[in-house]
Curated annotation (Swiss-Prot):
GO terms for molecular function: ATP binding; GTP binding; guanylate cyclase activity; peptide receptor activity; protein kinase activity. This is Guanylate cyclase 2G. Residues 549-826 form the Protein kinase domain. Residues 44-481 are extracellular. The keyword Zinc does not apply. It catalyses: GTP = 3',5'-cyclic GMP + diphosphate. Residues 503-1100 are cytoplasmic. Expressed in lung, kidney and skeletal muscle. Low levels in intestine. Its EC number is 4.6.1.2. Residues 901-1031 form the Guanylate cyclase domain. The lineage of its organism: Eukaryota, Metazoa, Chordata, Craniata, Vertebrata.
Length: 1100
């Protein structure tokens, strides 16, 4: 294989095919023949580029998964692909998760190795930049670990595909499963403990939360950063008081601890259920699945539902593949130090399938006589469903976006033979998007015949049950003795009490803002006399959303216009509520039943939470028939449609641009909120307040207003002129979602921006002599050679704005820019930045006010950047998990480590060197030397503890344990440091050479944070003292090793050790020690070792 960076063992492993040829004559014909033959042979060989980190502590280390690619290459070379009898090889580069180094390595692979495809990178730091360059160079890129989330849009990377299903997929499966099982209230519990290498919790948490929060009530969210059992129990205890259905988002190791904590808390009675999301981290659960005998496991496992791919758990073929990968990794060229099959990364299977999928695509294109070296054409072939593969990870089939979809199953612990196993009982079809029982004899009740209710019968706080009346023999006797008169009296009293209770309950509901503060008493609103309807309940006096085409009655509440006689025509009743002018949008009486639905209540709460200067404030809802209405802020200037209609002259561009900025800012906020989109953006839903600030309205509460989340397109009953702003892809749907889509909002914005540019109030197509239904029919016609759009004159606005409009109403939704890009274009088109309408009157003062928001945002970004700098600085002084706990104000408990290796070094003759140098020269010398050391140790799994003067202390095996790898890491690092020191030049003494002496020792230590002011992460124990003695008794330019470290290096293998003999060590007596002189395959120059220097000096 290609050469790799620094200390890794050489991977000289290439796979070639074809035959060698040579020229023995000088004739021109023979020379041309040889050139042609060599060209054909070169064409018959395909080189695969592979990027992954070497460091074994990384979850995607090549030492954990690289053999998966090697196995695939062997298969391809043993079973030739295509009519051209291709041969295959791969070249590996240690990406080190550094974007700059990875980019340089990729360029080198393309220019020197002539790679045909790149598999990787495995690090997100490098994925985006390499993906963009691969797309530019037309090189296929296969992402086998799901790190290309930034380039999932194939518009940016049209040569990229991803073998791992998107994380949103498992969120969709979870949503469908919860709906199928009838659970509505849930809690989310997850995180990553300090010792866990699982770093996907943030992305998976976001994907799950985005899917669930609009469909379910999330009663609690608990994030943890420590796996301590007491903290886990405390989190579970608080969550169990408000949730019975608990989603676990964590690694398998953490899940085991969480479930044990649940067992200790007694959450194993069957009233609680735990849904564990597992995409690949299956080592722990696979052990449970594979047991044939009765397994001893906590009772709480019976309440676990496992959501994982349908291929999950491993078939016999999967087990054989993992075993084969493990065996290959242990042998050259990888020579991995992993000690068991459990340490093999499950991503090795995706790596294997990535190459086979590429090879099969190459074969299909060769059969079709297409150029498989055309990366875009190759990816298009994949996305067109022309290539399928039955791989180790199951069926591999990509959609049109280059994303892979896998079927999922819901597993539960079920009886199997003499024991219990996790077996599937629900199956999710990723293409049909449906979930159904795994077998016909399983139903929604689950594998055990029943499942827990998502809440207690009386509620979590006993608030849904009345106190039961006392029972007993005495009461029975008294009841039987009651005479009819008393019975009548009791019934009358009961009726009176019930009426009183209902009256008080009604008052309670209205007076508790924590529960129903969005409910508004209709009597608390004072309707303005001139706008008060003649009688309540008449549709003509209301903003009736069910009849949006009625004269002067529209869905855009709070809008008015003036007639030519300056008579104000209000489009909705206006009133006073708590000192605010409010607009009332009346809803039909059938909405009374809808407000009780959980989905409607959830959306009401979302509307209450939306606070932005360009969003119409939502006050609440009146739920008292017949006056059911939505209450929002009243905007005095009406809608943008009214402003355009009533303007007697052409508005200034500053005037228009201010409105555009307000719309963009409002849409940016909405798209970032849980609502995700507006769905009805048009001039009549853009309201203008008394300060000439535009506010968006007309979104949300669709189910409450209309009784459904979709509207059915009806050719006869639809006012087609109201659809001019609706995107064509939505118009083609039979059921059009009220909420629309983000891309549809961009299209609506384009039409609206065009209305502003041309200042047209009667619709964007008023210059066309065609009926509205004909116009809509042309817009949604996908066969039209040129999509119908409104006229757009170039001289009406800035050319960049005109180009923006055309980009925003592109026929393909994927080609439309998002609102952040739109805002950036607006700033570029208006050099003065955002300018409000009143700027022309107030000059610089108003200009400052209009920029104030951007200044605050910039200062906030600077504050966040400075905060990140502080956090980054803290992370260089302390381990990351220690820094997080200190920032949170928590104490850090000391931790015991059973085995670590400690490195000490100092400079021989440093005191004399200091006497010959100025203090500034000494500081510069140490800074240059330690900067060199710091850069060198970055490639090793070590932790720099501290520096004191010329002493340098490093440890491996803490704060994150790495098994038996610590001695190997420290020894290799020591050889590197010794090598770079021999070439180090002292700035003010160029003729002098530093003489570094090093000591190593292996043993147990205790680590903890000491002090409050300038806290430090310190190590304690006899191991530290012994390592220091090894350094002080070492010789210049030598690595002195204790007997315990020597034993560890002999187990690791490949190191050159020379016995020094027995020496007297202060406080330890006679000790047998060794010199570390080299390592197999270590090509870096080291100082020569003489026997004279090995003589034992007098130890003080």
């Amino acid at each position: 294989m290609a050469s790799r960076a620094r200390s890794e063992p050489p991977l000289e492993h290439r796979f070639y095919g074809g035959a060698e040829s040579h020229a023995g004559h000088s004739s021109l014909v023979l020379t041309l023949f040889v050139v042609m033959l060599m060209t054909c042979l070169e064409a018959a060989k395909l080189t695969v580029g592979f990027h992954a980190p070497w460091n074994i502590s990384h979850p995607f280390s090549v030492q954990r998964l690289g053999a998966g690619l090697q196995i695939a290459v062997d298969k391809l070379n043993s079973e030739p692909v295509g009519p051209g009898n291709l041969s295959w090889e791969f070249t590996y580069t240690n990406a080190t998760c550094n974007a700059k180094e990875s980019l340089a390595a990729f360029i080198d692979q393309v220019q020197r190795e002539h790679i045909s495809v790149l598999i990787g990178p495995a690090c997100p730091e490098a994925a985006e930049v390499i993906g963009l360059l691969a797309s530019e160079w037309d090189i296929p890129l296969f992402d086998f670990v799901g790190q290309m989330t930034a380039l999932e849009d194939h518009f940016w990377c049209d040569t990229c595909v991803t073998l791992v299903p998107p994380k949103q997929e498992i969120g969709t499966v979870l949503r469908e499963s919860l709906q199928y099982l009838g659970w509505e209230y849930i809690g989310v519990f997850g995180g990553s403990s300090a010792g866990s290498s699982w770093g996907e919790v943030n992305e998976l948490w976001k994907a799950v939360e985005d899917e669930l929060q609009l469909h379910f009530t999330i009663t609690a969210r608990v994030r943890y950063s420590s796996g301590h059992s007491d903290l886990l129990q405390e989190g579970l205890r608080s969550m169990s008081s408000v949730a019975r259905v608990i989603i676990l988002i964590c690694s398998s190791e953490d899940a085991k601890h969480i479930l044990q904590a649940a067992e200790d808390l007694g959450l194993n009675s069957g009233e609680f259920v735990f849904l564990l999301l597992q995409q690949l981290e299956d080592s722990f659960w696979k052990e449970v699945l594979a047991e044939d005998k009765v397994t001893r496991f906590p009772k709480v496992y019976e309440s676990v539902f496992l959501i994982a791919p349908s291929t999950y758990g491993g078939s016999a073929g999967d087990d054989d593949f993992r075993k084969q990968v493990y065996q290959r990794l242990r042998r050259p060229p990888f020579q991995s130090s992993i000690s068991s099959e459990d340490q093999v990364s499950p991503y090795s299977a995706y790596l294997h399938d990535a190459l086979l999928l590429y090879a099969q695509t190459v074969e299909e294109m060769m059969k079709a006589e297409k150029d498989f070296r055309d990366g875009r054409q190759l990816i298009s072939t994949l996305r067109a469903d022309q290539v399928t593969l039955q791989g180790i990870t199951g069926p591999v089939l990509l959609d049109a976006q280059g994303k892979r979809h896998m079927d999922y199953s819901v597993y539960a612990l079920q009886k199997s033979g003499n024991g219990s196993r996790f077996l599937p009982f629900l199956h999710y079809d990723s293409f049909q998007k449906v979930i159904r029982p795994w077998r016909d004899d399983l139903n929604a009740s689950g594998p055990h015949g029943s499942h827990p209710e998502y809440k207690p019968d009386c509620g979590f706080h006993e608030d849904l049950c009345r106190t039961k009346p006392p029972t007993g023999a005495g009461m029975t006797a008294s009841v039987t003795a009651v005479i009819p008169t008393v019975t009548l009296l009791v019934v009358a009293s009961a009726a009176a009490i019930t009426g009183l209770m209902l009256w008080r309950l009604r008052g309670k509901v209205q007076n508790h803002p924590g529960d129903t503060w969005w409910q508004i008493h209709y009597d608390s609103i004072t309707l303005l006399p001139q706008h008060k309807p003649s009688h309540r309940g008449t549709p003509m006096s209301r903003c009736n959303v069910s009849n949006a085409s009625t004269v002067k009655i529209s869905a855009d509440c709070g809008s008015f216009a003036k007639t030519h006689q300056d008579e104000e025509l209000f489009y909705a009743p206006v009133g006073l509520y708590q000192g605010n002018h409010v607009a009332l949008c009346y809803i039909g009486e059938e909405a009374e039943a809808r407000i009780k639905k959980p989905t409607v209540l959830r959306e009401v709460w979302l509307m209450c939470e939306l606070k932005h200067e360009n969003i119409v404030p939502f006050f609440g809802v009146c739920t008292e028939p017949p006056n059911i209405c939505i209450v929002t802020q009243y905007c005095k200037k009406g809608s943008l449609k009214d402003v355009l209609r009533n303007s007697d002259h052409e508005m200034d561009w500053i005037f228009k641009l201010s409105f555009v900025y307000d719309i963009v800012n409002g849409m940016l906020f909405l798209h970032g909120s849980p609502l995700r989109s507006h769905g009805n953006l048009k001039p009549s839903n853009c309201l203008v307040d008394s300060h000439m600030q535009l506010k968006l309205a007309g979104f949300g509460l669709w189910e409450f207003k209309h009784g459904s989340t979709c509207r059915i397109y009806n050719q006869e009953a639809t006012d087609h002129s109201e659809l001019y702003w609706t995107a064509p892809e939505l118009l083609r749907l039979r059921e059009l979602p009220w909420s629309g889509t983000p891309q549809g909002d961009v299209y609506s914005f384009a039409i609206l921006l065009r209305d502003l540019i041309h200042q047209q109030a009667h619709g964007p197509f008023e210059d066309l002599e065609a009926a509205p239904e004909e116009i809509i029919s042309c817009i949604k016609d996908p066969r039209a050679p040129v999509p119908l759009r409104p006229s757009l004159l170039e001289d009406k606005g800035d050319e960049r704005i005109v180009a923006l409009v055309r980009a925003c109403w592109a026929e393909s939704p994927e080609q439309r820019p998002a609102f952040p890009s739109i805002k950036k274009t607006l700033r570029e088109a208006s050099p003065r930045g955002r300018v409000s309408i009143l700027d022309s009157m107030m000059g610089k003062l108003e200009m400052y006010a209009s920029h104030l928001e951007e200044v605050v945002e910039e200062r906030t970004c600077q504050l966040v950047a400075e905060k990140r700098k502080v956090e980054k600085l803290l992370s260089t002084m302390l381990p990351s998990f220690v820094g997080e706990q200190l920032i949170a104000g928590k104490s850090v408990e000391p931790e015991h480590f059973e085995s670590v290796t400690i490195f000490f070094s100092d400079i021989v003759g440093f005191t004399k060197l200091c006497s010959l140098s100025s203090p500034l020269q000494v500081v510069k010398l140490l800074n240059d030397l330690y900067s060199l050391f710091d850069h060198t140790i970055q490639t090793h799994d070590v932790y720099k503890v501290e520096t004191i003067g010329d002493a340098y202390m490093v440890a491996s095996g803490l704060p994150i344990r790495n098994g038996a790898q610590h001695a190997d890491e420290i020894a290799t690092m020591s050889l590197h440091l010794l090598s770079v020191t021999t070439n180090f030049q002292i700035g003010h003494m160029p003729e002098e050479r530093l003489k570094l002496r090093i000591g190593l020792h292996t043993g147990p230590v205790v680590a903890g944070v000491v002090g409050i002011t300038m806290p430090r992460y310190c190590l304690f124990g006899d191991t530290v003292n012994m390592a220091s003695r090894m350094e002080s008794s070492s010789l210049p330019l030598r690595i002195h090793v204790s007997q315990s470290t020597a034993r560890a290096l002999l187990v690791a293998g490949g190191y050159h050790l020379q016995k020094r003999g027995t020496i007297s060590v202060k406080g330890k007596g006679e000790q047998t020690t060794f010199w570390l002189t080299g390592k197999d395959g270590f090509a870096v120059p080291l100082p020569e070792f003489t026997e004279e220097e090995a003589k034992v000096p007098e130890i003080l």
